[in-house]
Amino acid sequence: MDARLEPYRTLVSFLGEALGPDYEVVLHDLTSEEGTIAAIVNNNISGRTEGAPLSNMALRFIHGKVYEKQPYVAGYQGASQAKGRLRSSTMFIKDGSELIGRSEERR
């Protein structure tokens, strides 16, 4: 995992506790080609665990370079096998205009 993401692990834990058990909070690690979950709380919502691959929606955001146009996407519809439809939001963690952990040659 990119060392610049390490402080966000604490933020994931904080948000999970502050928002409560009905909110899953996930930190993605983009250093590998497929990307993985680096930290997750309240994973009873999706059943995902650390090391699991990114969701299809996260991959669409990355491949569509949504992060170049906006800092976050809020209130879109997600889905979970365990919980059905979800209200989801994504914040892009960047260094300048680049996603942290996403190398230039994989863009």
Regions found by a protein language model. Give the residues of each.
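Conserved small/polar residues in nucleotide/adenosyl-binding loops
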Residues: 105-106
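Sensor-regulatory modules in signal-transduction proteins
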Residues: 93-96
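Glycine-rich acetyl-CoA-binding "A-motif" of GNAT/NAT acetyltransferases
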Residues: 99-100
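Structured interaction and signal-relay segments at domain junctions
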Residues: 16-74, 79-81
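Short amphipathic alpha-helical segments
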Residues: 5-13
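A short beta-strand signature within small-molecule sensing/ligand-binding domains used
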Residues: 84-91
